[in-house]
């Protein structure tokens, strides 16, 4: 997970409420659902929390990269993106731009269906899976979850936009 910097994307770990790494207990079911063994690229990571073998860091600044740069990074595989939750608009826009170029990305965000970014860049453009159950972003506190519901927006060519609920946990 990343936090915003002055120039755009900043990638930092820490206690900020906007800055949580995606736990493996979610990543593994996502990969299984997508039918992949690994993500091709993580668009917002650092060496401690990357969900792919390749990623962009704060110095790389994902949001100043072009949509073509994003496509070149992900290739024909799936990208992963867990952006900072404080300013989602530029990230959602870039996911849509990647999709229009033929790329695929799984985008983890709060389920803020009333937000402008959702209306403009997700609603009729991505396949949305509402996550059944809160995500435990802090692994040392198994009962702690992000205080809001989240969803996974799947941007990929050829898949119709829509909504569903996904029970990702093994309960």
Place the predicted regions along the sequence by residue.
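Class I S-adenosyl-L-methionine-dependent methyltransferase catalytic core
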Residues: 1-171
